[in-house]
Each structure stands twice: as C-alpha cells, then as structure tokens.
Amino acid sequence: MPAPWSLPRWRAYLAAAVLCYINLLNYMNWFIIAGVLLDVQNFFQISDSNAGLLQTVFIGCLLLSAPVFGYLGDRHSRKATLSFGILLWSGAGLSSSFISPQYSWLFFLFRGAVGTGTASYSTIAPTVLGDLFVRDQRTRVLAIFYIFIPVGSGLGYVLGSAVTELTGNWHWALRILPCLEAVALILLIALVPDPPRGAAEKQGEVAMRDLRSSWCADIRYLGRNWSFVLSTLGVTAMAFVTGALGFWAPTFLFEARVVHGLQLPCLRQPCNNKDSLIFGALTVVTGIIGVVLGAEASRRYKKVNPRAEPLICASSLLAAAPCLYLALILAPTTFLASYVFLALGELLLSCNWAVVADILLMVQMGLKPATCSFLRLPPTVLLPFPHDSLTDM
C-alpha cells in the first residue's frame, strides 16, 4: 500500500496563491478582446456577427481540446499539462498582436489557439486545489480561486481599454499579458506540487484503481450521475447569460451612451473605451462580493440543510434575471439605473462560481475530476454566436 502523501500547510497555500494568480491571467485573456472590441472591429473591418464568431472560435477550440486535457489531467502529470497550456496561450496571444488587417482569418486562428491553451487550465487547475484541501477549507480556497473569474474578467476590460487609451494602439494590450504569463509559468514550475489524485482525502489507493477505467466508462458513469447532469445544465444556462453579458456589455453601454447623446459613434481608432473601464470595475467589485457571499452562505446554510448549494444557486439566478432585464430595458431612458441593475445582476450571478465548483467536486466521488470539468464545457460552445447575430439585425 502506498505511503500517505502529505504537504506542509504553508506549501499548499502558496500553491493555491500561484494557481489563483494564473486564474486571474487566464480570465484576463478571455475578456481582454471584449474591452477593445470596437477597435478590433474597426481594425479588421468585421461586423458584429463576425466579432461574436471570434469568441465562438475561442470557446469552440477550448471545447475541442478540453477532452484531451481532461484525459491527460486524469492520467498524466497535471503540472506538465498546465505548463504546456500556459506556453500555448501566451505564445498565441502575443503572436496575434502582430497580424495586419488583411489577415483577419489569422487573428481568428490565433484566438482559437489561445482557447486551446486556456482549456488546460480550466479543466485541471481546480482539481489540483481539490487534492490539496478538504471540506470547509476546500470551499474557502475554491471561493478565493473563483473570485478571480470576475476579477480577471474585469481587469481584462480595464487592461485592454487603459493600454489602448495610453498608447493609442489596442495591440499593446495583447503584448503586456505574455510578460505576466511568463512569470506565472516560472512560479508554477517552482512552487506548485502535483499531488496524487485524491491525496487530500487520503484515498490514493482508490484513485489509482479508478484511473484504470476507460474514458468511455467515465462518460457513462457521469451521464448516470443526475446531480452532475443537472448542475451542468444549470451552469450552461448561467454561461449563456454571462457569455453574452461579458462579451457585449461594454459595446452595449457605449451604444447606449451614443443614444443619449453623451458620446459620438466610433468611426476611427482609438475608440472611447470609458464604458469598458466602468464595466470592468463593476465586474471586479461585484465579483468579489458575490463569490464571497455565495461561498459563505453555502458554508453556513449547509450546516442546517444538506441541499444548500443548489438552493443558493437557484435563488441567486432567479433574482439575477429581473435585474439584468431591467438593465437592458432602462438603458435607452435612464443610464444610471441601467448601471445599478447591471451591477446587481452581476453580483447575483457571481454568487454561483465557487458553489457550483464545490458541487462538482462532491458529486464526482473521487473519480475523474478533470473529465468532469471538461464535460461542463460542450453546451456553451455556440453561446456567443446567437447573441452576436442578433446584434446585426
């Protein structure tokens, strides 16, 4: 029988800090283009539907590569797989900043490569944290980890718009991130361990036995796990909303400002990215508050109700729906009220991130965690494109 695997607590927290930092950069990469979308459209002369296709290509490549990374993450070195992913997405992001206007198809291709690289992190990193911490400790660490989804998204808008404002060239936003990602790669290699599967629960022997099962057997097992299936459908619905909100909100706010006569239309670069800065700041603040509220409410409420997690997710999503609806309806008449309801909607949506991750780790029962993670991705692949086609109508 293998000896129990152990790691000093300070090392576990240090590894968690590094993974949180990389998660921040991961989501900055997801949404940095949204922060300068008008400039990108003007530079490549693409319509709203093609701009949305840009995000669909990104997510589609993430989807197609997620099964590969899920398989590798469950059976081989997670640390090596993560390192490869960071190298791929940072290299592709840097390369995309040097593409000339007549090669827009190449920009789409590189954004797809960025999506492929980020797939490794989205599927594997949470499982590493799950093997470093247990129970309430794991819930808190995952809450902090998932805070960096809205924080990274918001900072992506801020970085893109601020760098464009300073330099007059949106390409520089894509050239700064790879420098930060090079630091992240060094920290990952030096400070993050690769714990055995199930190490935190001291189930190393069980985990090793389960790894012998086939990939198809894993899929069959998860397809019969109704907690996993239903929570995945819930995450899909939330992704439909957050995908549209995250990609199009800055452009929507810009055009609402034009309707109110507060802003001239963007006819040449650089565009006024004030709304990207404001929306980015809102996303950061509401994201931090929402993730902390959701995680703490879940931790406290499940002491009296074992179904606390799904109830918190459902109630926050139901409450977010009218807020986001009012934000859209009120934008042409009262701009301030639109911002208020948009912030409330974002806060309520953010309550779900850490909670659904905890649900995933609980329902997998020590089996293929990275495979579970990638199975949440397929339904979301085409979500940006319907919204984007509608904006051209």
Give each language-model segment a name.
Residues 33-34, 225-292, 349-353, 357, ...:
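Extracytoplasmic gate region of multi-pass secondary transporters
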Residues 64-104:
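Conserved MFS/SLC helix-loop-helix module at the cytosolic interface between two early adjacent transmembrane helices
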Residues 87-101, 317-332:
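C-terminal ends and interior cores of transmembrane alpha-helices
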Residues 92, 104-120, 334-354:
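Hydrophobic core of transmembrane alpha-helices in multi-pass small-molecule transporters
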